Regions:
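Mixed-charge, low-complexity intrinsically disordered regions
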Residues: 1-20, 29, 35-96
Length: 96
């Protein structure tokens, strides 16, 4: 299964995480930890995936090099999973 470091933001709570996501063969389903997301195929409002367990809408994309991933400014910090922290800072942000 193909994996990639991605930015994930829950649209209802604003909670945001950078972590490793795995893709189905078609790319229409993503998995992160125990969560499964299906593509909204353009039907969501400022969201592109639906978490199948809760029905919550998420914005999931590749993290930006400048670190400005949020759609709207927020005081809630973006969490970075420990298993991808070094890769994110070195390869995506170019900080290490």
């Amino acid at each position: 299964m193909k994996t990639r470091v991605m930015y994930m933001e829950c649209k209802s709570t604003g909670q945001a995480t950078i972590g490793r996501v795995s893709f189905s063969k078609t790319g229409s389903t993503l998995r992160y930890r125990s969560l499964e997301f299906i593509s909204l195929k353009g039907s969501g409002f400022k969201a592109n995936y639906l978490e199948t367990g809760s029905g919550e809408q998420y914005w999931i994309s590749g993290p930006r090099k400048d670190g400005q991933d949020r759609l709207y400014a927020s005081s809630v910090p973006v969490e970075i999973d420990e298993d991808v922290r070094e890769e994110y800072l070195r390869e995506i942000r170019g900080l290490l």
